[in-house]
A protein has these predicted regions:
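Conserved ATP-binding N-box helix of the HATPase_c
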Residues: 2-37, 41-62, 126-131
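N-terminal switch/interaction subdomains of large nucleotide-dependent motors and GTPases
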Residues: 6, 21-25, 83-87, 141, ...
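Eukaryotic short linear interaction motifs
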Residues: 36-38, 81-83, 148-149
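Short, low-complexity, polar/charged sequence segments that are solvent-exposed and flexible
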Residues: 46-51, 91-96, 159-160
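Extended, regular secondary-structure scaffolds
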Residues: 49-54, 142-153
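Flexible ATP-lid and adjacent glycine-rich G1/G2 motifs of the Bergerat
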Residues: 55-145
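Extended, Lys/Arg-enriched charged tracts that mediate electrostatic binding to polyanionic substrates
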Residues: 135-138, 151, 160
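An alpha-helical interface "stripe"
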Residues: 155-157
């Protein structure tokens, strides 16, 4: 509905929801052009085949032929990062705890994720805005979890 702005609103809400206790979350928002060479390895033949078959992706050949890609870069600080076990397939980790990273990457509208819906983010649907703001319906993210600073993650998903 609001294009890139919806993803910015969602991002800010997520940063507030993930604030580290007694710290004010900070956000940095930037529109930038990035040379395609920086992330060409992420755009595989298999991925392109999926994009070609998606009704959501428009102007694919034009987008893929551009030497620079317009990006929306969203950064947050004083937040917990996306916790959980990325290699565990399920809403719970192997030790029975919630698995937010699985929910973020794989679930849309699967039961309430927060006990207090007033905080926002209670339905698990807002993350779709990141893909809707993308011409190739794709979103990449880098997360540094506050309890695992030495294990940053680079992940992404496409809403095809």
């Amino acid at each position: 509905k609001f294009g890139e702005y919806s993803s910015i609103f969602e991002f800010i809400q997520n940063a507030i929801d993930a604030k580290i206790e007694n710290k004010i979350p900070l956000v940095k928002i930037n529109f930038d052009s990035i040379k395609k060479k920086k992330f060409e390895s992420l755009i595989t033949k298999e991925f392109i085949a999926h994009l070609e078959n998606s009704p959501r992706v428009k102007n694919l050949s034009e987008t893929l032929n551009d030497e620079e890609v317009q990006t929306l870069i969203l950064e947050d600080f004083n937040t917990s990062g996306i916790s959980g076990e990325p290699g565990t397939w399920g809403l719970k980790t192997l030790d029975g705890k919630d698995n937010p990273i699985f929910r973020f990457n794989n679930c849309i509208g699967v039961e309430a994720k927060l006990e207090d819906a007033v905080l926002g983010g209670s339905e698990g649907e807002g993350r779709q805005t990141f893909c809707h703001a993308s011409e190739i319906s794709t979103f990449f993210y880098h997360t540094i979890r506050h309890n695992e600073l030495n294990k940053p993650l680079m992940m992404g998903f496409a809403y095809l």
